[in-house]
Amino acid sequence: MTPRMGGKLLILTWASTAFTLLGSHAVAQEPRPGVDWPQFRGVSAGGVAEGFEAPVRWNAETGENILWKTPIPGLGHSSPIVWGDLVCVTTADSGQADELKVGLYGDIEPVANDWPQRWEVRCLDKTTGAERWTAVAHQGVAGISRHPKATHANSTLATDGSHLVAMFGSEGLYAYDLETGRELWTVDLGLLESGFFRVPAALWGFAASPIISDDLVVIQADVLNGSFLAVFDVATGDERWRVDRDDVPTWSTPTVHDVDGRAQIVVNGFRHIGGYDLATGEERWRMRGGGDIPTPTPVVADGLIFITNSHGGEAPIFAINEGASGDITPAPGTLSNDHLVWSQRRDGAYMQTPLVYDNLLYNCRTNGVLSVYETRTGRRLYQQRIDGGGSGFTASPIAADGKVYFSSEDGSVYVLKVGPELEVLAENPMGETLMATPALSEGVMYIRTRGHLVAVG
């Protein structure tokens, strides 16, 4: 595809001239390892925060090892992010007792939610849980319906230490000053119909999160009509480029990594997995996917790009060379080629983003069956169920201090010892539904449940 540079854009507040007059040219900062968790799954979506002792046992029902617990109104599956002394989430609050149906089931009928919502960004003091600021991004009836297991605030925030970016799908893209909550700009992206392409009436809600890299905001919007990948200036909201994508709706957040000194965006997909040059939008490589509802985020580690998806009869895991180029789709009946180091056709994840930790790839299915592979060879070391069955697993794993954390939808957090065999160190109850991926900062875990943000330490 040929990128369209500087595409049409609606800036509703704080135009670029206002930035100049107010002296508001904020400077992006580098995240501090183990301290800052700036986007979905932390730095580069890796999900790892080293350098601090991490918790093993806690109980949110009794208060054991709970530092604070702050109510968050409304519904939201966006994961917490952490920067400096702030921890931030989004929510969509209707003021009603909104339905949320979790667990393992196959119902695809959407929830309409015809009553008005308030789309909010909430930032708390990470030490005390006290509110620092709340911004109302949008008010009104949602542009599209949602899946009964989803919300109208699924996308996780992203920050560069100065700007905070929120993506609310059809309700818009927003940027705030991280410290004050002052709205900087907003972009109307139009109606983004995120739904199952085989049943177009099943609109499930937008979920891909923004990411920030090199002063650019990256948005992947694979939807029923007019899928695209676009980048925006983080300071002004100006669109830098946009490329059309020939793909069906996906719910995956992209990843950015460097290849030979150039930043590259990597995207998951059904018809089109691929890499794009961050600066220009030029396509660098591509391949066809497998599962027809791609959700996991690509992960780059150990010189490889790991991509998985599942649904519709296929469930692949791909391990791709960082420097891949051209069309790398494997020939029929093969599992590797010059760019595809290894692949597995039947073990992919539907919802969870995989985790690479200590040269091991952790890949968990929605039913709680965990498979662990050697990253370089693709040799599977074990495949076992984490729990006794019955609960779904949607939140993605994170890791720290030799431990890997898996969260179930019924509100249990399982702590595993890293290694070639399954060893469960603890099962910790949260007392509420748990769909969002936790965050880690300075040895404290921040867990977003249905009704609260909880600090564990």
Tell me what each language-model feature is.
Residues 8-23:
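Bacterial N-terminal signal peptides
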Residues 25-457:
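Noncatalytic, solvent-exposed loop/strand surfaces
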Residues 1, 19-29:
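Short, charged low-complexity linear motifs
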Residues 1-8:
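N-terminal secretory signal peptides that target proteins for export/translocation
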